Amino acid sequence: VVTSGVIDIAVGRKTPIAVSSISSKDIQLKGGNQEFPEIMNKVPGVYATKQGGGYGDSRISLRGFDQTNTSILINGQPVNDMENGRLYWSNWQGLTDVASGIQIQRGLGATKLAVPSVGGTISIFTKAVDKEKGGSISQMVGNDGYSKTVASYNSGKSESGWATSVLLSKWSGNGYINNTSGEGFNYFTAIGYAPEGSKHELNFSFLGAGQWHHQRDVWVSIRDYQNFGDEGIDTRWNSNGGSLNGEEFSMRRNFYNKPLATFNWDWEINSKLKLATSLYGSAGRGGGTGPR
C-alpha cells in the first residue's frame, strides 16, 4: 500500500556499493531510550554519540565524515539542512517509533532526490499503511525520570483499497546530564490507496516531533569539570544550567517542530515502463536560547 518508486534501496549482489541494513525488529530491540542515531552504532563505518547529552542533540559520522557530508533521507526525501547540510535529530525524535527499516550506503551512491555525499547515504523508511486491522498501546520508563507512552492504530485495508495508520506518542525526562530536561510529542499518519488489480498506488504520510529540551555546551574544558565537580571530575556537570526560583533553568533551551508531508504516486504504465511521482514539503517553527 506504500509506494517506493523514489526510495533508493541498494540490492544485494546487484548494487556495487558497501551497504548495511537494520530491520524494524532491530530498531525496536535497540531503541529503548537511546537517540535514533545510536541504533546504527554497530554498523561498520558508523560512529554516533550523544554529544552534549541533551535530548536529540546527538550526531553521527559515516566513514569519518560528519553529517554535512552525509545524505540523510526519509522515504527518499533529503532532510539535511539546505543551508549548511546539518541535521538536527531533535526534529525527528519520532523515527524510533515509526521507522520500519534503515539502510546505510557507505561512500558515493546513486540517489534520485539528493546529491550523493562522500560519507555515504542513510535511508530511513517509515512504516507502510498496515493491511491488518489492529492497534496497540505501550508504556516505557527509564533512568533519570524518562517516560514514554505510544499509541497506534491501523484501520486495515478495505475492500475498496483504502487503509489508514495513525501513531501518537509523548515523552519526557530529566536527562542524565544535569539540567537537560526535555519533553515532546511525536505524530505520524499514513493514508494509502491501492485497489486490487489497479496499476496505480497512492500514499500520503505526515510525521513530525514537537519538542523542547535543555542543552549542554561541548567546548567546556576539563579544568572546569574539575573545579565544579563535587568529587573530582563531574561528568554530569552542565555549565549552562542551574535553578531559578526553585525550578530548573538553562541558558541553552531548544524548541522546535518540523513536520514532513509526503505524497507518492506510482503508476505502472506497462510491463516495461513505470512512473514514480513524489511531492513533499517541510516547514519548521522554533528556535533556541543561549548566552550572548
Language-model features, listed with the residues they occupy:
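Transmembrane beta-barrel wall of Gram-negative outer-membrane proteins
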Residues: 134, 141-172, 177-216, 256, ...
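Short, acidic, small-residue-rich periplasmic hinge/interaction motif at the N-terminus
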Residues: 1-29, 67
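Short acidic/polar hinge/loop motifs at secondary-structure boundaries
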Residues: 59, 78-106, 125
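Extracytoplasmic beta-strand/coil segments of soluble accessory domains associated
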Residues: 16, 37-78, 100
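Acidic/polar loop-and-plug regions of large Gram-negative outer-membrane beta-barrel proteins
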Residues: 192, 201-264, 289-292
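Non-catalytic regulatory/gating segments with a bias toward low-complexity or hydrophobic composition
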Residues: 40, 101-104, 122-124, 277
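Extracytoplasmic loops and strand-loop junctions of Gram-negative outer membrane beta-barrel proteins
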Residues: 84-85, 104-106, 133-136, 170-175, ...
